Amino acid sequence: MASRPGFLTDWPWTPLGSFKYLLLAPLVFDSIYSYATIRDHEKLLIVAVTVWRIVHSQIWISLSRYQTAKGTKRILNKSIEFDQVDRERTWDDQIIFNTLIVYLTKVYVSGTSTIPFWRTDGVILVALLHAGPVEFIYYWFHRALHHHFLYSRYHSHHHSSIVTEPITSVVHPFAEHIGYTLILGLPLITTFMCGTVSVVSIALYLTYIDFMNNMGHCNFELIPKFLFSLLPPLKFLCYTPSFHSLHHTQFRTNYSLFMPMYDYIYGTTDECSDSLYETSLEKEEEKPDAIHLTHLTSLDSIYHLRLGFASLSSHPLSSRCYLFLMKPFALILSFILRSFSFQTFVVERNRFRDLTLHSHLLPKFSSHYMSHQQKECINKMIEAAILEADKKGVKVMSLGLLNQGEELNGYGEMYVRRHPKLKIRIVDGGSLAAEVVLHSIPVGTKEVLFRGQITKVARAIVFSLCQNAIKVMVLRKEEHSMLAEFLDDKCKENLIWLVGDGLSTKEQKMAKDGTLFLPFSQFPPKTLRKDCFYHTTPAMIIPHSAQNIDSCENWLGRRVMSAWRVGGIVHALEGWKEHECGLDDNSIINPPRVWEAALRNGFQPLLLPSLET
């Protein structure tokens, strides 16, 4: 939001929220009906171009987030936080706006029913009009927007983002977009009035605008130096991402739209433009201090990745109705990942004190870890990731979710045994996860019910509870026939349930009203009881000093990390030299020691949930 919002700041459909796409429903139905009855394909092309523009922008979002996390040719190292993601979630409003304008023009303006598919003279005229009047008018309009009156009421909203993402380019107040539409629409309006407009010229011009906007705000340099050496005038006809990045950091330079020649003509070119361009091109891939290795969970988790939909990744993973309609696309994306991704890759970069923290994704779903045919492939990918990180000098790698399964690799011990000379420390985070669960149990608890798969974390929890004279009641399938009558009665009276994978619906129904379910597993139980309390999986709130946090870790809330991930970070912060993986006694670092180190470094436990009144 601008510092002093002016008239027409909000979009007309802002109150609709995510339902704003319903505005396009009549257009879609009408285009299908028109094609079915009178073979009018032009309305269908409007829908196709709209979809293409959304997909095109999403490709840029994913590419930019991957490249900036990797670090190669990154321009600015500053962080992006949740407030920027929330502010820029309206990036698609301008596509809806443009679509409605084109559709209404098609329906109500005479002469639009016979637009040819291609006209060479029209394409050339559009290019000339853009290079001349459009770039010139935009330059002075942009400078006017930086006058205090307009800047404080409108343009400051756009400049709230110092570090830009591709979608930053189109995040403006509604009034600004009206001005941009009038300016950028000049070539199309002129060619229409001259009778030289064509379907291709419209689609190409819109794609060109989107491409240049996204490229200019992607925060990594991608235009090679040899192009400017081969074609020196190109420097004045095509800006670079670093050129426009200076406009967001210096504010009073580099005003041009896509062609810097007007900045050179009127003396507003930033003197650092060339040097920033060269230094950005020379930046190499960043070496992290710690890596957290995770994987995909459900099919919809593709969209919740940081490289996926920014508006979804900034919120906890949950099922959404409209994602059901996108199942076919998710299946296609999952097929692409399985077919072309043979190694892990970076999806997120964070900073905490002097540490650079990366999250890497192993492109497999949770279901793949249940398949014996996939285990060898998964182990090879994890092993390759560890060896590659060790070669680069990474200090710690923590194994998240099912990457540390007991049956898969013995909580990571298999890799240490195969490669005893590893310099990188392998951490499963079990010590901290156990301590998080133990400190979530309300003070004064005398007994708890244990139900779930027996894991390393479960063993550590039960051992500690027994040491503290807390009674642990066990409910397992193999014990059911012998203890059914006794346990059924007792379970209804126990208000603290420690639960892991394998908790059934029937067993949840046995719990008494007000029961607190405390998961010790990587995955949360299904929330079936509204009269019970469900705590999150072992996790901690990260310190405010942690930077570049703009996405959520699976089902966890904002600025919350799983205990297994935090365990790896603490391991790196403390500089511990031992591995924390495997099942023997030496594989668990003294849990209280890890807990105290986490608190000392600013990590905080989550509050217990409460029932809604």
UniProtKB/Swiss-Prot annotation:
Tissue expression remark: Not detected in any tissues.
UniProt record similarity statement: Belongs to the sterol desaturase family.
Entry GO MF terms: iron ion binding; oxidoreductase activity
Pfam hit, one: CER1-like_C
GO cellular component terms, A-Z: membrane
Primary localization: membrane
Subcellular location: Membrane
Origin: domain of life: Eukaryota
Name listed for the protein in its UniProt record: Protein CER1-like 2
Keywords associated with the record: Membrane, Transmembrane, Transmembrane helix
Entry-linked InterPro entries: CER1-like_C, Fatty_acid_hydroxylase, Sterol_Desaturase_Related
Residues spanning the membrane: 13-33, 44-64, 95-115, 122-142, 182-202, 322-342
GO biological process: lipid biosynthetic process
Membrane topology label: Multi-pass membrane protein
Residue span(s) of domain Fatty acid hydroxylase: 134-268
Residues spanning the signal sequence: none
Organism of origin: Arabidopsis thaliana
